[in-house]
Amino acid sequence: MAFNVAEFRANMIGDGARPNLFQVSLTFPTVATNGTAAAQKTIFMAKSAQLPGSTVGTVPVFYFGRELKFAGNRTFTDWTLQIINDEDFVVRNALESWMNAINSHAGNVRNTGAVNPTGYTVDAVVTQYGKAGNELKSYNFVGVFPLDIAPIDLDWGSNDVIEEYSATFAFQYWESNTTT
């Protein structure tokens, strides 16, 4: 096959999808302090995210010394957001209170509002947009809850920067507007 720039360009629909045209919508459960305000702010403060992946495992079966592989179960890797921190700490405080409701710092107990998964899990959506502002694809993460809030490094020599931190979430599975 000969190298053909015109064919390549003709197959690059919309000049390619751009990773900076996205939005995250993360709701917070009622056990999270200021969850409504944090949800509204996350739309603007979620600096980076991922479109999800998944893995189908294999089930090896041996037959006369030969390994045969059969399709196994699907698994999903954790989902991480990079979040910009502003001076009201609304998103971080809501994430901390959400995690504390799941398992408190001192008491090692769960908040009564978070006894069942419906009390501490929510859905989250990542939407990828085209350059004209049209929605290209969206993913709904089902049963999201926080696993990790990364520390924020402080440094007297850090000038001209805004604090950022990552938050990692577990989820049950994802659904897409284009995947059945």
Indicate where each model-derived feature is located.
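Glycine-rich, low-complexity intrinsically disordered segments
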Residues: 1-180
